[in-house]
Design a protein with these regions (language model features):
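Glycine-rich beta->alpha junctions and the first turn(s) of the following alpha-helix
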Residues: 74-172
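Charged, glycine-rich active-site and insertion segments that engage polyanionic ligands
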Residues: 188-191
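Buried hydrophobic positions in well-ordered alpha/beta secondary-structure cores of metabolic enzymes
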Residues: 7, 34-36, 64, 94, ...
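Short Gly/Pro-enriched turn/cap motifs at secondary-structure boundaries
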Residues: 13-16, 40-43, 55, 81-88
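A structural signal for short hydrophobic beta-strand segments in well-ordered beta-sheet cores
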Residues: 23-26
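A short core secondary-structure module
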Residues: 31, 35-75
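A short, Trp-centered hydrophobic/proline-enriched beta-strand micro-motif
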Residues: 1-10
Length: 191
């Protein structure tokens, strides 16, 4: 069979500061008790498992695998997003969730492991942003060719041409930057 997963690091009050997370777990025999929440998590409303990052009793960050159906684990969907509407997004809420200790990811603690995953995700996100920018450019170009002012398309005006050229220059710079990063990643030289 197939299993869908999600990655839970971002918290409601600590989105750009993962070190400030408050999600935590405490030892309880062969289990840990997980409390806290995550927000803006892609695939959370239907994921079978969630790789979640939380602090232990010593304030060290660890990854845990939380399975759908565990008591106290809910995944409400976020509605009315303004962007990335093709992906289902939601929250991960942990209310005294009993997670087996065997579900703690071995060998990694601290922020290094989750941030490594984010670095790869951000590379992909850069291409998505470039795609959006390219669509904006195409829309602006089409509009400037169709919009007639004083008997001519506004695309015939030097100021409009300058704005479109600057737009395309910035998009091309972003493409080249992301292409170069991809090349470095393929060569294991991205730092």
């Amino acid at each position: 069979g197939k299993i869908m997963g999600c990655f839970g690091l971002t918290e409601p009050d600590h989105g750009s500061n993962p070190g400030g997370m408050i999600s935590n777990f405490k030892s309880d025999g062969d289990y840990v008790i997980l409390n806290g929440s995550k927000m803006w998590i892609s695939n959370s409303p239907f994921a079978d498992i969630a790789v979640v990052w939380a602090k232990d009793e010593n304030k060290r960050i660890h990854g845990l695998i939380v399975e759908r159906g565990m008591d106290g684990f809910t995944t409400p969907e976020t509605h009315n997003k303004w962007s990335l509407r093709a992906s289902s997004t939601g929250e991960l809420i942990f209310d005294n969730v009993r997670v087996p200790k065997k579900n703690i990811l071995p060998g990694k603690s601290g922020l290094g492991a989750p941030l490594m995953c984010l670095d790869s995700a951000r590379y992909g996100i850069s291409w998505g942003a470039i795609g959006v920018a390219m669509d904006c450019y195409s829309t602006a170009l089409k509009y400037s060719l169709e919009r007639i002012q004083f008997g001519k398309p506004i695309a015939a005006k030097q100021l409009q041409q300058k704005k479109l050229a600057e737009m395309l220059t910035e998009i091309t710079k972003a493409q080249l930057l992301s292409w170069k990063l991809g090349k470095l990643k393929n060569e294991d030289r991205a730092t």
